[in-house]
Amino acid sequence: MKIAFIGEAVSGFGGMETVISNVIHTFENSSPKINCEMFFFCRNDKMDKAWLKEIKYAQSFSNIKLSFLRRAKHVYNFSQWLKETSPDIVICIDVISCLYANKARKKSGKHFTIFSWPHFSLDHKKHAECITYADYHLAISSGIKEQIMARGISAQDISVVYNPVSIKTVIVPPPERDKPAVFLYVGRLKFEGQKRVKDLFDGLARTTGEWQLHIIGDGSDFEKCQAYSRELGIEQRVIWYGWQSAPWQVVQQKIKNVTALLLTSAFEGFPMTLLEAMSYGIPCISSDCMSGPRDMIKPGLNGELYTPGAIDDFVGHLNRVISGEVKYQHDIIPGTIERFYDVLYFKNFNNAIFSKLQK
């Protein structure tokens, strides 16, 4: 059986790439009869390909400015590739690729099943309507399932598969009782927009009690975020690490104790930083944004949720943690995310695909 994963060029550094490569390697290791390849639609050859090690891939290049001509070239190139490779399944890692796959299927005369597998919120992406060109759908969160259904697709054609996280052997403990609370942010630094780091700083600036914030990540607003911390007078409590290739090693080796990971996003696809934190026993205080956090966080057990933009509620959660009024058992938190661990994830992903093929 041949499975093709297709999509527009990606950065090569994100969590999406990690998930895709893990899925491909797991499929191929599960059976010698399964062969996976990738096909990318590119404007240039700037994509970092280190993550594609041991993965066979092909590319279609077009930098034509007129979108309908650019798309026509991609469809033609992909249809030629389909004639050569004859996949049984095509999994689209973004929505525009559903359109390419559908048109190329007709053009090539090949028969295969198209799955969409979008990794971002549909309400914040262009061409979201193109998802209807797929036959079936793999949703990485219950929120994205709702977004797919809102575009006229039956719930029977959608499987919620989430994203996987590996089981850890280490628990990151909280600080000792007489020490300041230690908060953690891991991710891109966008002052407003998607990540709302401004809300993170505004909330912390309004808390009572002692705390530190450790920030692991970089982004276009790095300097703007630093300047805002100075403006609020909290710069002495914020420790900046910049981008790190192994952020959780930094947490274990340098930070060592964490009270909670914080996420103040306006929207997400499936924020893996929450799952990674909880796999180490770290509770998470997150906005209940579309989509992902509500699938992972069980309030009072492994963290808390608040309405995006509701800074008063966010501050309330922070104050209760800082004062010790609310405590979490770090050692039981990894058990609260059991359904996201690798073995169960791949079993569900496999079933989501092959159950549809048997129809």
Swiss-Prot record:
Keywords: Glycosyltransferase, Lipopolysaccharide biosynthesis, Transferase
Residues the entry annotates as binding UDP: 244, 276
EC number: 2.4.1.-
Alphabetical list of SUPFAM superfamilies matching this protein: UDP-Glycosyltransferase/glycogen phosphorylase
Signal peptide boundaries: none
Reaction(s) this enzyme catalyzes, per UniProt: alpha-D-Glc-(1->3)-[L-alpha-D-Hep-(1->7)]-4-O-PO3(2-)-L-alpha-D-Hep-(1->3)-4-O-PO3(2-)-L-alpha-D-Hep-(1->5)-[alpha-Kdo-(2->4)]-alpha-Kdo-(2->6)-lipid A + UDP-alpha-D-galactose = alpha-D-Gal-(1->6)-alpha-D-Glc-(1->3)-[L-alpha-D-Hep-(1->7)]-4-O-PO3(2-)-L-alpha-D-Hep-(1->3)-4-O-PO3(2-)-L-alpha-D-Hep-(1->5)-[alpha-Kdo-(2->4)]-alpha-Kdo-(2->6)-lipid A + UDP + H(+)
Protein's UniProt keywords contain Glycosyltransferase: yes
Protein family membership: Belongs to the glycosyltransferase group 1 family. Glycosyltransferase 4 subfamily.
Functional description taken from the UniProt entry: Galactosyltransferase involved in the biosynthesis of the core oligosaccharide region of lipopolysaccharide (LPS). Catalyzes the addition of galactose from UDP-galactose to the first glucose residue of the LPS outer core.
A Pfam family the protein falls into: Glycos_transf_1
Pathway membership, UniProt: Bacterial outer membrane biogenesis; LPS core biosynthesis
GO terms (BP aspect): lipopolysaccharide core region biosynthetic process
Disrupted gene: phenotype observed: Mutant lacks the alpha l,6-linked D-galactosyl residue of the core lipopolysaccharide. Deletion mutant shows a lower invasive capacity than the wild type, but the difference is not statistically significant.
Gene3D superfamilies (UniProt xref): Glycogen Phosphorylase B
Presence of keyword Calcium: no
Top-rank taxon: Bacteria
Protein name: Lipopolysaccharide 1,6-galactosyltransferase
Gene that encodes it: waaB
One example GO MF annotation: glycosyltransferase activity
Top EC group: transferase
